Amino acid sequence: MAALRVSRLSWTSSRITANTRLGDGELVDIQREVKLGGSIHSKGVLILASFLASRYAAEQPLSLGASLVFEQTYGQVEGDSASVAELCALLSSLANAPIRQSLAVTGSVDQFGRVQAIGAVNEKIEGY
């Protein structure tokens, strides 16, 4: 399991955890499964799954199962600004390499693994 604290657009921060294991290539978005993930957030997780599959399963099926969750978040999660943090948490879990909890991360990732430009920078910094 890997954990990473992420600064959300609002005035709070959240802890994202990832769990990886042997599996069939499925990336479970727990927020979506319990109907707490909005469509843009779900799109971001699907993009992560596409990136992981293209990077690590180009020649053979991905024998990995993974899950992602915003810990102790009970309201709707929306937007793709946490996808960099989610990717970091997944890679941390895969490598069994903990991430320092003093870091704040925001931003989205495209399906090629490239970090994209972020918006509302001032609000995110002030909110953290």
Per-segment meaning from a language model:
Residues 1, 14-128:
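Peripheral, non-AAA+ core regions of ATP-driven protein-machinery
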Residues 1-7:
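Catalytic or ion-coupling anion/metal-binding cores of large enzyme and transporter domains
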